[in-house]
Amino acid sequence: MGSAFERVVRRVVQELDHGGEFIPVTSLQSSTGFQPYCLVVRKPSSSWFWKPRYKCVNLSIKDILEPDAAEPDVQRGRSFHFYDAMDGQIQGSVELAAPGQAKIAGGAAVSDSSSTSMNVYSLSVDPNTWQTLLHERHLRQPEHKVLQQLRSRGDNVYVVTEVLQTQKEVEVTRTHKREGSGRFSLPGATCLQGEGQGHLSQKKTVTIPSGSTLAFRVAQLVIDSDLDVLLFPDKKQRTFQPPATGHKRSTSEGAWPQLPSGLSMMRCLHNFLTDGVPAEGAFTEDFQGLRAEVETISKELELLDRELCQLLLEGLEGVLRDQLALRALEEALEQGQSLGPVEPLDGPAGAVLECLVLSSGMLVPELAIPVVYLLGALTMLSETQHKLLAEALESQTLLGPLELVGSLLEQSAPWQERSTMSLPPGLLGNSWGEGAPAWVLLDECGLELGEDTPHVCWEPQAQGRMCALYASLALLSGLSQEPH
């Protein structure tokens, strides 16, 4: 079963935000961090096919302004009662018999049920508050250390302006049951008969605390000589203005060009993907476009010698099993472009990083860009999916899931519409059902799955994770292949 918290968030946002202005919170752990006036950074996406992520920086707007004072009060909107229930059952039976011969009969039933009842309300900052706030206060000097770091990396910074929160503690329960029975008889001199039955029940309960944020809206900060707040963010506007043009810095052979701060690793990746083609027309927004994007990235990996590939794979397998190592590696690569040489890391993250840098500590673009893309895809996936990818990498069974995910992405077009697809037996391998690796990989993406008659119910919200899963499988599989 997929994340119960994410399912609740998805249902609430569908009902209360038809304009698509709210950003869903993706984990219960981070749900308390998104509060009005809190500052967040927008982590650029490594692909056109999944959305950027927002990350709290543990600062409030008051931390970067002076004179020091509490934030103005927020407005509380009216409460909405949300109730969502699902109860479904599929059952069937079969009997095979011939006169005077063996008889075999069996039956099975599968049921799913869940229910959620909660009150949700909004907290928002009055738009007029920003004008008053910026008139009465100004940027703190010297600039806050965290802002200095974000400036050096060229990150865009936003402030949370509105949130949807739970009014009381909510318990979400989802149950999945399977039952089966069978009997047989073998006539003859000695009649042999037998029967059996069994059941399996899974129950997942998640408690969402009172005041948990389910979704939020943001405004963009623009920091120059003073602070401005853009209530309608402009994709072309940067929080920190780049240095004056004409500034040149030296480069070293095989290393990243030392570009002015503000040209982040992710922007270098996008430049690499487009290769002179306008961003809007780089790739079509369908499976063919996704496959073309992944192939563009993987071309660099095909040139690596087997020894380096093996070292990289061993490090990546370790990173997939260690969430802290994954975050440390992502952070190091993000800083590597704008801050110069990267600091060495320990453990599996360090093993991967050693494959991507020169002795000077500078990143090698031909190696770093594909890994940055891969990490961007991996961060879209859950910890459970990471562990399954590590196991598939170890057992060299990546191709089966890759073909299955690719087939589903191709069949489900257009991705913006719900649909139901049958699964060809040839793509399912030896097992399909609750707990099977392929089942769990898809279930964690937010898809509804059918077992007895294998099928998938496509949900538009699953697009980002499914595309990221395909990219992860394709790149890991490509690294694992022997050179042609």
Curated annotation (Swiss-Prot):
Entry PTM: Cleavage at Asp-275 by CASP1 (mature and uncleaved precursor forms), CASP4, CASP5 or CASP8 relieves autoinhibition and is sufficient to initiate pyroptosis. Cleavage by CASP1 and CASP4 is not strictly dependent on the consensus cleavage site on GSDMD but depends on an exosite interface on CASP1 that recognizes and binds the Gasdermin-D, C-terminal (GSDMD-CT) part. Cleavage by CASP8 takes place following inactivation of MAP3K7/TAK1 by Yersinia toxin YopJ. Glycosylated: O-GlcNAcylation by OGT leads to reduced cleavage by CASP4 and decreased LPS-induced endothelial cell pyroptosis.
Effect of substituting residue 15 to K: No spontaneous pyroptosis-inducing activity
Effect in UniProt of substituting residue 377 to D: Spontaneous pyroptosis-inducing activity
List of residues that carry S-(2-succinyl)cysteine: 56, 191, 268, 309, 467
Top-rank lineage group of the source organism: Eukaryota
Consequence when changing residue 240 to D: Abolished ability to induce pyroptosis
GO BP terms in the entry: defense response to bacterium; defense response to Gram-negative bacterium; defense response to Gram-positive bacterium; innate immune response; pore complex assembly; positive regulation of inflammatory response; positive regulation of interleukin-1 beta production; protein homooligomerization
Family: Belongs to the gasdermin family.
Swiss-Prot/TrEMBL domain comment: Intramolecular interactions between N- and C-terminal domains mediate autoinhibition in the absence of cleavage by inflammatory caspases CASP1, CASP4 or CASP5. The linker helix loop inserts into the N-terminal domain. The intrinsic pyroptosis-inducing activity is carried by Gasdermin-D, N-terminal, that is released upon cleavage by inflammatory caspases.
Protein name in the entry: Gasdermin-D
Organism field: Homo sapiens (Human)
